């Protein structure tokens, strides 16, 4: 009898850890925990790590609203990781959820993806379908810089200058870059005094110090020629 009781106790003792392990595993992989894990990693900008739990969550029978949000994080992660199919994924999300509150940002992300591809006309069309002022400050500044650069690339220097001036007034991060491109635009417009005023402070800038001496020398030469011509 004692042997039977001992065997029964041993059997129960062996089963308890297995049951607890199963419960723990189920808790970890439950839909709500997968969503929370993916979202936390996404907010930490750990996009590669965020995708597996979010994908697993989406494949399960999940809350409709949470599924929409999880799919939003997935397509944004694809953009951040420069997935070659990111544009298609972002567009598909808009087709699936046309009333999403994230539409404005997704249009901006598609525009940015086109910008990085060098497709400036498409980027401009999408940037102009977005309200960049509604984005977070850092992302707004990044995309305003891309917008201004797109205008410069397609030869619309007037709009490029407007956007570079706008960004320069609000973003210390892009102040020198904007000064350089504004000065370059003024140089191409033969507004040499304005161009020189912008180029001179950039002579010690790590990014532009190799470029600006050429323009400064050219401007001085043009101003000297203009002065000599006036004297004649």
What do the predicted segments below correspond to?
Residues 225-232:
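Conserved small/polar residues in nucleotide/adenosyl-binding loops
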Residues 22-55, 59-72, 80:
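N-terminal leader/linker segments that initiate helical-solenoid repeat arrays
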Residues 24-28, 58-67, 94-105, 131-141, ...:
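Short solvent-exposed coil/turn linkers within tandem alpha-helical repeat scaffolds
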């Amino acid at each position: 009898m004692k042997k039977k009781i001992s065997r029964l106790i041993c059997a129960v003792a062996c089963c308890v850890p297995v049951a607890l392990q199963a419960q723990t595993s189920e808790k970890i992989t439950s839909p709500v925990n997968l969503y929370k894990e993916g979202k936390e990693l996404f907010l930490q900008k750990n996009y590669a790590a965020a995708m597996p739990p979010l994908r697993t969550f989406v494949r399960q029978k999940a809350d409709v609203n949470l599924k929409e949000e999880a799919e939003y994080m997935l397509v944004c992660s694809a953009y951040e990781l420069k997935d070659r199919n990111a544009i298609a994924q972002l567009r598909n999300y808009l087709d699936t959820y046309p009333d999403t509150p994230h539409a404005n940002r997704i249009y901006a992300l598609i525009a940015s993806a086109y910008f990085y591809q060098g497709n400036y006309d498409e980027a401009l069309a999408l940037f102009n379908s977005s309200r960049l002022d509604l984005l977070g400050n850092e992302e707004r500044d990044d995309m305003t810089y891309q917008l201004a650069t797109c205008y410069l690339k397609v030869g619309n220097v007037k709009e490029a200058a407007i956007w570079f001036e706008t960004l320069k007034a609000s973003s210390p991060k892009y102040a020198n870059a904007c000064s350089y491109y504004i000065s370059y635009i003024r140089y191409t417009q033969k507004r040499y005094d304005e161009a020189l005023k912008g180029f001179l402070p950039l002579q010690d800038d790590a990014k532009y110090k190799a470029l600006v001496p050429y323009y400064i020398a050219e401007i001085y030469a043009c101003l000297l020629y203009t002065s000599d011509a006036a004297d004649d």
